[in-house]
């Protein structure tokens, strides 16, 4: 695992940035073991991101802190730990891909429990709990409420008055 600890994801790269220029920028922070700029298979052009692996994980941390948000070849780059970015950043990635938007919002705070209950009760709990209380009131609040009050109310009133008259 020490290999992954020293590995950084570098995103937002200029398409002209080469592995050599990236190594030059990052080698200030320590011994670089490997630099990879990910390229498109057919066009061989940079896809705008890559990986820099340091011999020492501490150097990688220093580089990440120092270089995140900095400009390289005229583009602001994003630097993250390679192993962690997919887990931390897309925390709900697994749940999100199979569970859809609503589930992702609800399942975020639950972690494992949300994933486990995906097909079961917590899915419906999220739907009714999340959608009913916040969905209909907050999100649709004005239009839904006024629509229901005006036409629903007047319709009901007139309907009730017909029933009581007869």
UniProtKB/Swiss-Prot annotation:
Function description: Cold-inducible mRNA binding protein. Acts cooperatively with elavl1/elrA to stabilize AU-rich element (ARE)-containing mRNAs by binding to themm and inhibiting their deadenylation. Essential for embryonic gastrulation and neural development, acting to maintain the expression of a set of adhesion molecules, and cell movement during embryogenesis. Required for pronephros development.
Pfam families named in the record: RRM_1
Domain free text: The glycine-rich domain, which contains a number of RGG motifs, is necessary to regulate nucleocytoplasmic localization.
Name of the protein in question: Cold-inducible RNA-binding protein
Keyword Cytoplasm: yes
Low complexity composition bias: residue spans: 121-166
Keyword Nucleus: yes
Species annotation: Xenopus tropicalis (Western clawed frog)
Name of the gene: cirbp
PROSITE patterns in the record: RRM
One GO location term (cellular component): nucleoplasm
SMART domains, A to Z: RRM (SM00360), RRM_1 (SM00361)
Keywords for this protein: Cytoplasm, Developmental protein, Methylation, Nucleus, RNA-binding, Stress response
Alphabetical GO biological process terms: cell migration; embryo development ending in birth or egg hatching; gastrulation; mRNA stabilization; negative regulation of nuclear-transcribed mRNA poly(A) tail shortening; neurogenesis; positive regulation of translation; pronephros development
Compartment list: Nucleus, Nucleoplasm; Cytoplasm
UniProt cross-references to InterPro entries, sorted A to Z: Nucleotide-bd_a/b_plait_sf, RBD_domain_sf, RBM, RBM3/CIRBP_RRM, RRM_dom, RRM_dom_euk
């Amino acid at each position: 695992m020490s290999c992954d600890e020293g590995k950084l994801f570098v995103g937002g790269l200029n398409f002209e940035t080469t592995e050599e220029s990236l190594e030059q920028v990052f080698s200030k922070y320590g011994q670089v073991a490997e630099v990879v700029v990910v390229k498109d298979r057919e066009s061989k052009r940079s896809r705008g991101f890559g990986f820099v692996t340091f011999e020492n994980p501490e150097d990688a941390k220093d580089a990440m802190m120092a270089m995140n948000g900095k400009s390289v070849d005229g583009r602001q780059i994003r630097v993250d730990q390679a192993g962690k970015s997919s887990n931390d950043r897309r925390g709900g990635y697994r749940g999100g891909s199979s569970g859809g938007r609503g589930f992702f919002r609800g399942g975020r705070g639950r972690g494992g429990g949300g994933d486990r209950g995906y097909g079961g009760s917590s899915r419906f709990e999220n739907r009714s709990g999340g959608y009913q209380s916040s969905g209909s009131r907050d999100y649709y609040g004005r239009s839904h409420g006024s629509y229901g009050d005006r036409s629903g109310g007047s319709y009901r009133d007139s309907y009730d008055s017909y029933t009581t008259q007869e």
